Amino acid sequence: MKDLPDRRLLLVHAHPDDESINNGATMARYAAEGAQVTLVTCTLGEEGEVIPPALAHLTPDRDDALGPYRVGELAAAMKELGVTDHRFLGGPGRYRDSGMMGGEQNHRAGAFWAADLDEAAGHLVAVVREVRPQVLVTYDPDGGYGHPDHIQAHRVAVRAAELAADPAFRPELGTPWEIAKVYWNRVPRPVAEEGFARLRLALPGTRFAKSAAVDDVPGVVDESVITTEIDGTPFAAAKAAAMRAHATQVEVDGPWFALSNELAQPLFTTEYYELVRGERGSPRETDLFEGVAP
């Protein structure tokens, strides 16, 4: 087995752009500190909408060119964050973006939402046993906001964490490995409320006409739920640049951004988490690896 860095972080996301919006500052920080940062993206995001008019030819109802284009956007975003280890679950295009909940895309051939759970988890087990992460970051059971691919990414990540530690599960995938800490992406409600209060004052000077609402932000929870706070302020520019790299999906204007709905949101540079498995390193962690042995 090759030598591994002392700290190893695995993030599991549904589509290209989710990682930069949710964890961009965290990823940039740990990459800069020399930790192994591995991102697994479950689909190519083929069903996303397209913001720039100049790229309208990529819309999903045309030649199915959006997914491959977003692969390039993701590569550019990873360069901005300093992350060199990125994989697609099962390989690029193995699982397809399922579209929004209730749509016909949920059940089309290859849709991630319709994937066999243990088969999909097996692809992730291979990654876990290879890179041996101490920390896993993914979504909560609702996927943050109910998107089928986000929910499925949560299910696959949690199942893979279980199976990777089981010696009886597919020994050909490598030596069993137990992940020490599992986190869900979160945003504390007071932080979101303060961010939107600032946004409402600043909105007339932005390129956006309207603001989203606090509850439009995935993963908003009461402050008491938060266990971990990662100050990504030194990496704010890297996070913003990574989000800009996802130009089909995200529009950034200073400390604000919008998705294809054109509703402005705050761009958070401090990122928050809920520890759901493993020992908390301190009452309010400031490092995902607190209490973790190399």
Curated annotation (Swiss-Prot):
It comes from Streptomyces avermitilis (strain ATCC 31267 / DSM 46492 / JCM 5070 / NBRC 14893 / NCIMB 12804 / NRRL 8165 / MA-4680). Its cofactor is Zn(2+). GO terms for molecular function: N-acetylglucosaminylinositol deacetylase activity; zinc ion binding. Gene3D superfamilies: LmbE-like (3.40.50.10320). Zn(2+) binds at H15, D18, H150. The lineage of its organism: Bacteria, Bacillati, Actinomycetota, Actinomycetes, Kitasatosporales. Belongs to the MshB deacetylase family. It catalyses: 1D-myo-inositol 2-acetamido-2-deoxy-alpha-D-glucopyranoside + H2O = 1D-myo-inositol 2-amino-2-deoxy-alpha-D-glucopyranoside + acetate. Its EC number is 3.5.1.103. Catalyzes the deacetylation of 1D-myo-inositol 2-acetamido-2-deoxy-alpha-D-glucopyranoside (GlcNAc-Ins) in the mycothiol biosynthesis pathway. SUPFAM superfamilies: LmbE-like. Keywords: Hydrolase, Metal-binding, Zinc. This is 1D-myo-inositol 2-acetamido-2-deoxy-alpha-D-glucopyranoside deacetylase. One of its GO terms (biological process) is mycothiol biosynthetic process. Binds 1 zinc ion per subunit.
